[in-house]
A protein has these predicted regions:
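FIC/Doc superfamily catalytic core
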Residues: 1-347
Length: 347
């Protein structure tokens, strides 16, 4: 049986110089004040973040649908048909529930099981929310459609008691001023992943819990910029650091710092990107100038989707029109045509 000492673990990791630096930078962005756009425009940014969380978290687990079907599901409210489509909508429902209840919902066993239940409800209403009844494995899904085992989690007959103890210790830590809450969140998530309490869908539930705990403890990043999207973009690092931190976990000899530092860097990256998005939209300048600024600031070829994400308050047609004019004027280069168009500054 695994025994936790969450408080001491968090306090020890919080003294790591890299952790201290990351937290300091996160708090800098977390404390910044912005002139936020009106509610309608801000809702667009929230909807984009939510959709990206849904698609990214599922893609990490090998669940994907094409863009046309995705648009139909999210924009036209078309009923899901395949298991993949139902998985996306189930995750979306769980995420919407989190945004509704996080201010008053406490972290407990019932809530965690309910997130799993929502995740699976459209596929098999009797599957989600039930603790595992057979040994499961943490697997990394590779681009060639194969997978590899990263870690062997807690045994089924030890799962309930182990998770209950983890939840109790997490809530107990909240009252101790010495415990850094960001570090606490990611130590908890690391332990949750090592327990892997459900037969399937644990990775998705861990990302739902990440969103919930960040919101609950005052970090509203995921409301406007998806951490799951950033994890997907750095998925190799995710599994590498999870594997490093899980070594010796069953014997209480694991080093959580690898995973915690990785997740803190994800949060910092998200805050930086959100800061850039809001600062660009604060500027009182023509759309053409904003697009030139975005492409000029990028040190890489930037996609039309990236430009649309930053200029969330502008219509797609308007952005496409300006991009076309800038190409004709020779101010930017079109490096790739079609669905995945890429643009770069013309030096």
């Amino acid at each position: 049986m695994k025994f936790f000492n969450l408080k001491d673990t968090v306090i020890t990791i919080s003294g790591n110089p890299t952790v201290i630096s990351l937290i300091s930078n996160i708090e800098f962005y977390h404390g910044k004040k912005y002139t936020l756009p009106n509610r309608i425009k801000l809702n667009r940014l929230h909807d984009l973040s939510k959709r990206r969380s849904v698609t990214s978290s599922n893609e990490i687990e090998g669940v994907k649908v094409n863009r046309k079907i995705e648009d139909a599901l999210f924009n036209d409210n078309v009923d899901p048909e395949t298991d993949e489509e139902k998985m996306l909508i189930g995750y979306n429902n769980a995420l919407e529930h989190i945004f509704k209840v996080y201010t008053y919902q406490e972290l407990d066993d019932k809530f965690i099981r309910y997130l799993s239940e929502l995740e699976w409800k459209l596929i098999n209403p009797y599957f989600g929310g039930e603790y595992k009844d057979h040994q499961n494995y943490i697997r990394e899904y590779l681009p060639d459609n194969t997978s590899r085992t990263v870690f062997i989690p807690t045994k089924p007959d030890e799962t309930r008691q182990t998770l209950d103890n983890l939840i109790w210790q997490f809530n107990d830590c909240l009252s101790d001023y010495r415990v850094n809450r960001l570090v606490l969140i990611f130590v908890f998530i690391m332990d949750f992943l090592c327990i892997h309490p459900f037969n399937d869908g644990n990775g998705r539930v861990s990302r739902l819990l990440t969103t919930f705990l960040l919101l609950k403890l005052g970090y509203e990043l995921d409301r406007y910029y998806s951490t799951s999207y950033l994890v997907l973009k750095r998925i190799g690092e995710y599994y590498d650091n999870l594997e490093k931190s899980s070594k010796g976990w069953h014997q209480d000899k694991s080093d959580y710092s690898f995973f915690v530092i990785y997740m803190l860097s994800i949060v910092l990256d998200g805050y930086k990107k959100l800061d850039y998005i809001l600062s660009v939209n604060e500027r009182k300048e023509p759309l053409k100038q904003k697009i030139m600024r975005i492409i000029g600031d990028a040190n890489y070829a930037i996609s039309k989707g990236d430009v649309e994400e930053i200029l969330f308050s502008n219509k797609r047609d308007s952005i496409e029109e300006v991009l076309g004019k800038l190409i004709k004027e020779g101010k930017i280069k079109l490096l790739q045509k079609g669905k995945y168009s890429l643009y770069y500054k013309n030096i």
